[in-house]
Amino acid sequence: MWGFVSTVVLECILGASQGLGVTRMNVPYLLGTIFTPNRDHAKLIGVFFHFVNGWIFSLIYVAVFQSLDRASWWLGGLFGLVQAIFVLAVLLPLMPALHPRVTNEQSGPTVERQLEPPGFFGLHYGIRTPISVLVAHTTFGIILGAFYAVK
């Protein structure tokens, strides 16, 4: 249950960040366009895919909590912070190599519409993008760590 709650909160933080102009990054859209060029369907597919990822990561967090025989808000927050830094420093810069519809920084114009590459720390989507990603993922971890009871 807490995996679902933490994923909903993460999605809300990222969605609010985009809606309030903190970032231009639309994570469901970015993920959904991996599977379809249809921009309307991409958002729905991306939300589903991001929720599945959230549940998978929740299980990973639980496995780590169980192996450490402890869970706490600060430990979950630390894991969330590490996850966010990995997303920002590794996954987002690799998007042009992983995503069929993200152009790279060296490409010129193409006939097909391409998505802008996020760049290091997602800075191509705005200078405050790293802040929203760090806050969302750290909050995700805090919720899991605070409410998961190690048995």
List the predicted regions and their residue ranges:
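Juxtamembrane/disordered regions of integral membrane proteins
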Residues: 1-151
